Amino acid sequence: QYCQLKGIPNVGINDIYTGNGVSELIVMSMQGFLDNGDEMLVPSPDYPLWIGAIKLSGGTPVHYICDEQAEWNPDIEDIKKKITSKTKGIVLINPNNPTGALYPKEILEQIITVAREHNLVIFADEIYDRLVMDDYKHIAISSLAPDLFIVNFNGLSKSHRVAGFRSGWMCLSGDKTGYREYIEGLDLL
């Protein structure tokens, strides 16, 4: 139902994973996705769990700038400069932790364009999606890219103030055709 409410297309029951909070699922997603030496783009400033999960999985985190002078939005040109032949994906934390920035549709569309051009998987950490103020509205990046493979994360700890309850979910959206081995790995984990 969450995916329906957020307008996230192409998600079936077998595309949803539950876990002991989003933290567990982030680690699991990286362990199934990364090979030694693979690079993941991560926002700076970042939520430290992403760095740890990437390193634990044999990957290398590469920070892209979220510019304070631009309301903490990701610097798209900096993202493009950081992409190498080893880059496999991009982490998007929206709303961002720790900055609190809520990314506008235009920024999300630019990130989608970069991901398409470079065949990157987007890992969308959107656990703060219900904690937006002042009539702002969160847009799930997956709702803008029904064709693009995106790994989405959310849970109850922030929006329902039950951090100790440890209930999170991860859903896979978009075209999963080229990611069967990854999905099989997740199923084993």
Please tell me what each predicted stretch does:
Residues Q1, K82-K86, E109-Q110, T177-L189:
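Short, intrinsically disordered, charge-balanced linker/junction segments flanking boundaries
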Residues N20-E24, M28-Q31, V42-G59:
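Substrate-binding/gating loop at the entrance of the active-site cleft, primarily
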Residues S57, E117-H118, L148:
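Helix C-cap/helix->beta junction micro-motif
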Residues V62, E68-K137:
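Active-site phosphate-binding strand-loop segment of PLP-dependent enzymes
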Residues P146-L189:
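Conserved core segment of the aminotransferase class I/II
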